[in-house]
Regions:
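Glycine-rich phosphate-binding loop used to anchor ATP phosphates in small-molecule kinases
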Residues: 37-90
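Short alpha-helix boundary/capping motifs
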Residues: 1-2, 69
Length: 133
């Protein structure tokens, strides 16, 4: 509901980024069904695919929920190995819950949330559903 997938889709369609996210591994026939036993594998596939795309010279956007800072380590490592530049975007909008994640799960993630340290924040901007804003 923070706008991660929406923002990643925009970058993919408008600027040619490869859009990756662990949530895509939990979609079956258009329905999102999270399986915590497959979460680590889904994130590992995203890191692998991001690294491959970066090695091929592609721009990559990863729309994952990294609740704890250490959860970004795979993407950070892949970016460093590929010799690419990394930019973090912290989405804070309310775009609705497109994956129907239970409210209790969202509340638990918010309670564990570690915001990006100030040194990782390059810019702040607002992305809205209305293209006139």
């Amino acid at each position: 509901g923070s706008g991660k997938s929406t923002f990643a889709t925009l970058l993919s369609h408008s600027h040619g980024f490869v859009h990756l996210e662990a949530d895509s591994h939990f979609m079956t026939n258009g329905k999102y069904t999270f399986d915590p036993l497959r979460a680590a594998d889904a994130h590992a596939v995203v890191v692998r695919d991001a690294f491959s795309a970066m090695q091929a010279g592609r721009k990559v956007v990863v729309a994952n929920t990294h609740v704890r800072l250490w959860e970004m380590s795979g993407i950070v490592g892949a970016t460093q190995l590929a010799g690419r530049t990394l930019c973090f975007v912290e989405c804070a909008a309310n775009w609705g819950n497109i994956h129907d994640v239970p409210q209790a799960a969202l509340d638990a993630m918010r309670a564990r949330w570690e915001p990006l340290p100030a040194e990782f924040r390059a810019i702040a901007f607002r992305l809205t559903a209305n293209s006139d804003e």
